[in-house]
Curated annotation (Swiss-Prot):
Residues 64-310 form the ABC transporter domain. The lineage of its organism: Eukaryota, Metazoa, Ecdysozoa, Nematoda, Chromadorea. GO terms for biological process: regulatory ncRNA-mediated post-transcriptional gene silencing; transmembrane transport. It is found in: Membrane. This is ABC transporter ATP-binding protein/permease wht-1.
Amino acid sequence: MHKAPISTLILDSLFSNMMLAEMMNDDQLELLKHQQTGIQPVVPEGCNLYWSSLNVTGPETKPTNFVDRFRNNMPKRRVKEILHNVSGMAESGKLLAILGSSGAGKTTLMNVLTSRNLTNLDVQGSILIDGRRANKWKIREMSAFVQQHDMFVGTMTAREHLQFMARLRMGDQYYSDHERQLRVEQVLTQMGLKKCADTVIGIPNQLKGLSCGEKKRLSFASEILTCPKILFCDEPTSGLDAFMAGHVVQALRSLADNGMTVIITIHQPSSHVYSLFNNVCLMACGRVIYLGPGDQAVPLFEKCGYPCPAYYNPADHLIRTLAVIDSDRATSMKTISKIRQGFLSTDLGQSVLAIGNANKLRAASFVTGSDTSEKTKTFFNQDYNASFWTQFLALFWRSWLTVIRDPNLLSVRLLQILITAFITGIVFFQTPVTPATIISINGIMFNHIRNMNFMLQFPNVPVITAELPIVLRENANGVYRTSAYFLAKNIAELPQYIILPILYNTIVYWMSGLYPNFWNYCFASLVTILITNVAISISYAVATIFANTDVAMTILPIFVVPIMAFGGFFITFDAIPSYFKWLSSLSYFKYGYEALAINEWDSIKVIPECFNSSMTAFALDSCPKNGHQVLESIDFSASHKIFDISILFGMFIGIRIIAYVALLIRSYNNT
């Protein structure tokens, strides 16, 4: 990456038409001031992108249920052809639109060109940039991809999001903080986001924020910060009205006119939007039916016997003509074949074929010294614009903002902890140490573990699964390392998982009348912190392994409830059947409960009422005289205090490592 003056990154014309349409806001005045400076838009020259003989196959059906995935006698799934011998090109300084009906293959073609979402697909063929074969790392280095669905961390403002992206995508090696900040402000102005720059992006049904149109513009702003040579857009007008859609495509056309290579897929463009395309690629049944200037497609269809009716949207006519009707599939296939043959018989069609064949030969014979390094680049050694430390700091900042701003992450949890702690403290208020209250005191300690587990563990799962798609997308875009994200998020969230357990323990410990010693209180706080963090580690692991909120929330209690049952409160260790004792060894409830019980009962040397002369001989024999006898009655040993703490700490670290490995595997599969 070579440093260029920040002025060369200015795209003054981008979204200027959109701004002029918003006459009632102050952003137009900012844009006019910006234009009056006389700075001309300078965009890095784009690339000529070629794809040759692309063939893509994939499974026709997925396993119908969980059992079918593991049945030995499951019939082999049939394979279907998704793309067949697809060749084409996207020229520098041109806007290419890929059109077709549902199932035509346009989304698959976009995925192949961007090297994304290709799991379970067999892809054959080659992609070249300016005549040189390009792997997925080269494509991602030179391009940006605006995906159909906007994904953001909703607790950040528009400006903060762009500052975050600029810090990671522009890097700290080539640009100073001042240059990055200047670029962010320029893009905010160009995108018409000045008036909402300090508005939070928003979380659906939780936190009100930007509108759909503003989020779409923010998506564009995120991707063009570094002015990529190639811009891919998947359904850029999705969710926008016709007026705004026209201005979005006009903005893309402006980018192309200034030298960028722009490729989009689009669904049912209006006639105005269609007129903005330099070239169109019409697809049907996984084949390219036409590739060339948009204004030459309608005459070709007319020549083949399918004229466009008067006053009819040409894009609708082209797509409807190439649509496959299941009730009359033979006629549809005949129409598609006739138009394709008509296109191939033209000079334009022959030139497309010739370019495809030439690039196929070039790709087959392409060997250079520089290509060797590209072939060895993998997910684990790819290059990033920002250093690990810069990535960590930026991700920590974003995660911290999420913690303090998300209503479900702090305020609700704090209120929940306070209410539960005070209710527990009132129920067990100043419980005395007597033979009759031994079970109550043990219940206080087990409640410590159970309450902190269920109050924080289960609500944390949907928070992680909601953020996971954002992380996977940003990671696939090469914005940051998986390790930097995981470390930053864990450290940013750790303070609340220290403060909340201490707060709960402080209220319950002193209100319920547990052993009144400061060091015993500190040890109980330590155990509560460890139990909480083991529980959170499990939520991390389950969420990253299963990724789906419903599945994760179903699996979690299946694991946690049996572990809790063998925690030592409901059944003693000696009473557990031998074939279930291993569950007790895995129970973090058991280690936490034992540590708290030792902390309480080991300090109690005498239980006075057990020396009452009025008690019967049988009652005296069964009455524990001190805390050690209480521990023996529940199969706990006072010598296990440090051992229990060590096991809990080991579980905390070990399960976090499992969660990280699961996230790493998921990130790898998503690249």
